[in-house]
Structure formats: C-alpha cells, structure tokens
Amino acid sequence: LCQQQGVNLVYVCTDWMSHVPIAIHAMEQGRSVAVEVPAALTLKDIWALIDTAEQTRQHCMMLENAVYDRFEMAVCQMVHEGLLGELVHVEGGYAHPIGDRWTPWRMEYSRLNAGDVYPTHSIGPVCRLLDIHRTDRMHYLTAMQTNAFLGTEMYQAVMGKACDSFANGDQTSTMIRTVKGKTMLIQHNVMTPRPYSRMFQAVGTAGYAAKYPVPEMQLSPEMAAKVGIEVEDDKLPLNASQIETLLNYYAPSFPSETITLAKELDARGGMSYFMDLRLA
C-alpha cells in the first residue's frame, strides 16, 4: 500500500498489537497515518510513534471519535466559555457488553492484561474539558479492578477452550488527580449486562452536564441567562427543550449539508464522519 503512487494517508484499523509497527512503517515511507484506538499499548510504543512522526514530519492521528460526538463537543464549548464555572470534576467510561464483537486477539489480550485496556473513548473527551497538556496535566492516579467474575466464561465462549486464569477484571475504575487539583473518574466494563454508556459528565462550580443515561444539565440563573434561558429554580435540572437549546447554541459551526451527510453516513450521529473530516 505504501508503495502505491498517490497514497498520502494510511488508516490503521488492525488488531491493537499491530498498530504501532504498521504506523511507523507508513510514516517512514512518507505517508501520514490515522490509527485506530488505542494507538499504542505501552509508553515505549507511544514515544516510538511520536519520535517517528517528528523525524519523518508526517501526521500521526489517533482516531478517537468520541471527542466529535455532538453532546461532548457542545459541552466542551460550554466549559471553555465558562458556562459551568470552574470545572472541578469530570467522568468518562466505556461500558457495555460487546457480545459477538469479541475477537480472539482481543479476548487473549484481556486474558493476559489487567486494568483499563480500552480507555480512550472515556478519557479523550474529558481531557479536552480540562485542557490536559494545554494548561493542566495529570499528576497521579489510583486504579483498581474487580475480580474477573465473567472472564473465564467469556473466554470459553469466544475461544472454544478453557483457561485457568483471566487477568482483566469485569470492572475497572481509575481516579486521576491533575496538577491544578481537578479529578477524573474513568471506568471500563465490557463484561456485565448493562446499557451502552460512555459516562460523560462535567461538574463545575456553576453548572453540571451529563450525557448518560439521558442528557442532563443544570445551570445557575446567571449563566443560563447568558444564552437566553430562564431558570426559576437553580436546584432543578434543565428540561429537554432547554438542553436542546444549549446543544444547538454551542454546536460546532459545520455547514448544514455537512451535518446532514454526517448523519446519513454515520448512525451514531456523525461523530466518526466529523473525525474523518479532520483528515480531508
């Protein structure tokens, strides 16, 4: 592929373990790369991607579509315009049983590795809220996981053979504190039955926003008035109509035809289309 004339960009959508060698090879051949999440699995490999991109002067983008979700983009704009006041805490997660989407390589990786093995859908959007690596950075974390109550059972179902042990717990929770004293709660669970959730939540001194299980927002009367919303009781959440008003007001300024096309091509509201548009 890299030897073909006219190829400027290579998408890497393979198993996690092969992301880095493929991406590095493509950049060394003078091709920019877009790498599926997670782009790399170790700090050594992360630095290898960074070093290669800088040495070859090629773009290397991790394809994290969750940061292009309509709700996440609108809340990010609200936060940066101060509508929630000072942000103090954020949450994100990746939780739903992946069922028939299990592949042998992914199951084997989970058998061998503990911790949050798929964190970017959750941590990507909330890092943007806190301006991580812009005005703040992560300082330290505490993480724990449950036992693998379903791991061996799922391994048997996917792999067709038994295993004596399974390293990845059913639920992983990670608490991160930033240098500026903000906190992040990141969760991962693809084993137990539950509705899909990325647990997106922003907690500020003047407001609150959360996407799951249903969109919720709460604003002070002063902040709500800035966008023409009347709040009679600041102890009550906004109604659905008021939330929609906010989402429209703070929506990214894509042309209407782009938004229509994104929704037609992407059943999840267009977030993958908007992500790909960055590479056009």
Language model: regions and residue ranges:
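Predominantly a Rossmann-like dinucleotide-binding segment in NAD(P)-dependent oxidoreductases
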Residues: 56-61, 66-166
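Beta-strand-loop-alpha-helix segment that lines the small-molecule cofactor/substrate pocket
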Residues: 8-9, 15-16, 20-68, 82
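Short, well-ordered coil/turn residues at beta-beta hairpins
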Residues: 13-14, 187, 192, 204
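Active-site rim elements
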Residues: 110-116, 161-163, 188-189, 258-267, ...
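Active-site beta-strand termini and strand-to-loop segments that position acidic
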Residues: 174-180, 202-204
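A short catalytic or substrate-binding loop motif that flags glycine-/basic-rich loops and adjacent residues
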Residues: 120, 165-170, 178-179, 193-194
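A structured beta-alpha segment of the ubiquitous adenosine-cofactor-binding alpha/beta core
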Residues: 1-8
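C-terminal helical cap and adjacent loop that interface with cofactors, partners, or active-site loops
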Residues: 127, 195-204, 210-213, 219-280
